[in-house]
Amino acid sequence: MLAALVASLCLGAGLGSAPALATESAASLAHRALDDCEAGRQSGDRAERERFFNNGRDLAQRAIALDDNSADAHFSLFCNQGEAMRLDGESLKDLVGLRSLIRELDRTIELQPDHAGALSAKGTFLVRLPRLLGGDVDRGEAMLQRVITLDPTAVNARISLARVCEYRGRRDEGIEYARRALQCAKDLGRADKIAEAQAMLSELGASY
């Protein structure tokens, strides 16, 4: 079914719907790009994931070309480029790609300072990157705290905060964040995030 969706998008881009696409708004393109990013995340097939992320990246770039002041367009580009970089496992070796991702996050936050998704991603980068590459645990933790105020259901931010607490020796607080992340993931029906929250709890030596 997911492959059929990708095929329909590709066909639509090249055939009779071209006039409609020519007038498509940046907001609509950004929305479709984010949908592709999420579909790619949920797919278990590597080739299919790659197709979704590549298509999402192209849609995001078209959205930015139409409106460089669209926060969602820049965030959708970050989302698809970032997931494409992680297809074969996370790596910090691609510094050019990493800097490109951070630029898109910074542009998103510049345009929309309360963009919870961008703040969560930037905060996670700050707490995970070494200082040499721009990491700043204190600043990242503050940013992640802001995210959970903006979005009470934020899963990623809570998992990242749990990891910060583990790093700082605040195990009980970390367990609280991880358990709340697990509950939010269950409420949202996100099997992938449930697994991440459970892994964090295991790392903290807590039951779930």
Residue ranges and their predicted role:
Residues 17-59:
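N-terminal leader/linker segments that initiate helical-solenoid repeat arrays
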Residues 73, 118, 157, 190-191:
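TPR alpha-solenoid repeat register
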Residues 33, 38-47, 78, 83-92, ...:
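Short coil/turn linking the two alpha-helices of tandem helical-hairpin repeats
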Residues 58, 64-65, 106-110, 145-149, ...:
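Conserved structural position within tetratricopeptide repeats
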Residues 51-55, 91-104, 132-146, 169-178:
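Structural signature of tandem alpha-helical TPR/SEL1-like repeats
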Residues 164-167, 171-208:
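Terminal, low-structured helical/coil segments at or just beyond the last alpha-helical repeat
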